[in-house]
């Protein structure tokens, strides 16, 4: 996970990049944490070293949109990693799950929190307490995935197409859009609407707001300056 965080932070700082796609192989999206490594830890080890805290860096520090393109297995930490991304696309036969209960523990990298927010308490409770897996089609039907695809290739291509679309817009507006949607998860509707309005107003201080609205009025394609 350290290597992934390092790469994402570098891409986040690269001004030529507007959005990112995170994917694995056709067989598996991500393997999750090392169970053999975990099996030797006690409470002092896990708590003292903030075990798997690094898994929280992606949603907390990356400002550009990240799209997960999930094929194959996404279990445990792999499922949590997919849910950390801003948009989740998946193959209809992708295999999701939080099987930690079978190991005598629970999800530790946000699985219980993000899954509950996405699909509701009852379904999340069922999945986490039974350790049952669910398919990519289920993920889409339940609202966890934004899109579902018939083949692994279509999954990756679809994610790349969306990333290219996002990258074609003003970096400032995209960053603001991600910020306000994420903020909606942390506060009530009244506070969220007020926060959104403040961020909306702030964009009127950008060059891109002038460029975008003038281009619309003149029926031209905007040439963003990203400032």
Predicted regions and their residues:
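C-terminal long alpha-helix characteristic of the crotonase
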Residues: 2, 10, 89-94, 136, ...
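Glycine- (often His-adjacent) and acidic-residue-rich active-site loop
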Residues: 2, 6-9, 13-16, 23-61, ...
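Glycine-rich phosphate-binding loop at the start of an alpha helix
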Residues: 32, 52-53, 76, 133, ...
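CoA-thioester-processing core
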Residues: 54-61, 69, 75-129, 142, ...
